[in-house]
Amino acid sequence: MAARSLGSGVGRLLRGLQGRSGQSGWSLSVSRSTATRLPGCVPAAAQPGSYPALSAQAAQEPAAFWGPLARDTLVWDTPYHTVWDCDFRTGKIGWFLGGQLNVSVNCLDQHVQKSPETIALIWERDEPGTEVRITYRELLETTCRLANTLKRHGVHRGDRVAIYMPVSPLAVAAMLACARIGAIHTVVFAGFSAESLAGRINDAKCKAVITFNQGLRGGRVVELKKIVDEAVKSCPTVQHVLVAHRTDTKVPMGSLDIPLEQEMAKEAPVCTPESMSSEDMLFMLYTSGSTGTPKGLVHTQAGYLLYAAMTHKLVFDYQPGDVFGCVADIGWITGHSYVVYGPLCNGATTVLFESTPVYPDAGRYWETVQRLKINQFYGAPTAVRLLLKYGDAWVKKYDRSSLRTLGSVGEPINHEAWEWLHKVVGDGRCTLVDTWWQTETGGICIAPRPSEDGAEILPGMAMRPFFGIVPVLMDEKGNVLEGGDVSGALCISQAWPGMARTIYGDHQRFVDAYFRAYPGYYFTGDGAHRTEGGYYQITGRMDDVINISGHRLGTAEIEDAMADHPAVPETAVIGYPHDIKGEAAFAFIVLKDNISDENMVVNELKLSVATKIAKYAVPDQILVVKRLPKTRSGKVMRRLLRKIITSRGQDLGDTTTLEDPSVITEILSAFQKYEEQRAATN
């Protein structure tokens, strides 16, 4: 059944473009003939200002669409002279060239000038009922004190700063403080191991690290400072570690360590913002690829901020005075775009959720919605599937009448979870937006909203491209698939302001990863289906990347984490469907002949993955096999391993390139015994 609601954001966009300052006189008229030239582009409607007309305008005339939006939405120090200069063949991406601005001014100062006591942040701390509200004035003062502290300790424009902190006002201030002085932040999820943290610090050549003594999550204490201490032992570029206190517990302070709150208290609550060029780096965020090394994706100033703000406003139908509740961690791109930068640029009240969906019980989300009167709720399908199993009573116990929009992010949402979220959580009245985007895209690219008024929303489908996003489906030979009811590799044919600009220190890797497979197009790595109606449904990853609870992870990373074990000469990791996580990791390992205690090795491998990457990366299942299925050239055929565990070896497809086809029977037999043993112990 389709859910319906007004696509009111589109009308407001048009009115804003035509009348915000009385300066915008550009036309939205679009000819039907030009709008149909781009594959996947929605045909233009006769009505100016309709979703099809705006969508076609953004696709056909990017400068005319984005130029006025950037001019009127953002606060500029110096106007830009060129809206865009992009070439996907070389990975060249530039927006609003010649312009200068400061992101923190756009997120803080402009709102403080108008309404300083408006609530910027509601910190929903780990213990329910202990929320803290921070005004825009308070957040600006905290940001300036932190910015001055960084400068006093030698952090300046262009320096990199690692932030290893859980969701908190001080973490947000740390991000904005970096933006204010022109430093580049790289937030590392505060669940990553010391080794993963060190790898990111070293790749970015960070001068400073900002952290807490400890973190609190789900009633547990997380020893953040200990992890940082271990990490910086191998990080020669780190000159200072700024340590704040989340708990009263004292931690050892070494020669690099600086007590952050004490130092901030000495500083003035005013800091002159650096004027940054539109294409200066704002932040780096590390994400997994199909190879083993995480890549530091670079996002820049103006284009990213504009795109985050516009998608936040239009996809979620954000209106002034709303309380926006995105429960993502700031260590991921969702937290960057829809906890911090998008909402704050729009002057919104944004919720910082420190806890878990089931602490102290399975009603935590909905009790928070009731208490904080949240209007938009944005979370991951993994959490929805988990809470679904606890039943409806935990939801219905609380008043959710404040909710207008529900959002899903991180992975495709299955039909059952979509229906439960819509009917039970949203009482069948809330708009539900299943959003597709990536760390690389900077913001939402495909979602049911914005749309024309009253447009349908279909369960489990991302549906409509955002303005300026022109999806294209490719077949295996690199040909563009036209029309509806087709499936292929999801590409985007045109640049948009929010997309990443490069991989830090390795632009060729950026080009190879995203623009080489289909020259002239951005390749997302995902597959998609386009319906007869022109709607898009994401079908999942097409490369060796798995999505565990909304966290993208390369199988090669897990394999690398296990490769150092002296008893394990070979490993192969694949993803498989999981009821709660969406996907989980399944590892096949080959042991040396003299190993007698398989269980001990398996446990050691799990510990190794948790230590080198994070606990969420640990394979749910590990199967010992005598050998792996390889081609004559030595390549492991992971496709066959996936077939073995998902369909018991049925429909294996072409196996003629296998060096020894009998390996399939061998692994099938081992898997069957493994399953029997698991069934007997459960």
UniProtKB/Swiss-Prot annotation:
GO terms for biological process: acetate biosynthetic process; acetyl-CoA biosynthetic process; acetyl-CoA biosynthetic process from acetate; propionate biosynthetic process. It is found in: Mitochondrion matrix. Interacts with SIRT3. Inhibited by acetylation at Lys-635 and activated by deacetylation mediated by the deacetylase SIRT3. It is an enzyme of class 6 (ligase). Catalyzes the synthesis of acetyl-CoA from short-chain fatty acids. Acetate is the preferred substrate. Can also utilize propionate with a much lower affinity. Provides acetyl-CoA that is utilized mainly for oxidation under ketogenic conditions. Involved in thermogenesis under ketogenic conditions, using acetate as a vital fuel when carbohydrate availability is insufficient. It catalyses: acetate + ATP + CoA = acetyl-CoA + AMP + diphosphate; propanoate + ATP + CoA = propanoyl-CoA + AMP + diphosphate. Keywords: Acetylation, ATP-binding, Ligase, Lipid metabolism, Mitochondrion, Nucleotide-binding, Transit peptide. CoA binds at R217, G218, G219, R220, T334, S549. PROSITE patterns: AMP_BINDING (PS00455). Disruption phenotype: No visible phenotype at birth, but exhibit significant growth retardation at the time of weaning. Attain normal size and weight when fed normally. Exhibit hypothermia and hypoglycemia when fed high-fat, low-carbohydrate diet, leading to 50% mortality. Display strongly reduced whole-body acetate oxidation when fasting. Fasting adults exhibit hypothermia, reduced capacity to sustain running and low ATP levels. Pfam families: ACAS_N (PF16177), AMP-binding (PF00501), AMP-binding_C (PF13193). This is Acetyl-coenzyme A synthetase 2-like, mitochondrial. It comes from the Eukaryota. ATP binds at G410, E411, P412, D434, T435, W436, W437, Q438, T439, D526, R541, R552. Induction: By fasting. Reversibly acetylated at Lys-635. The acetyl-CoA synthase activity is inhibited by acetylation and activated by deacetylation mediated by the deacetylase SIRT3. The modification N6-acetyllysine is found at K389, K635. GO terms for cellular component: mitochondrial matrix; mitochondrion.
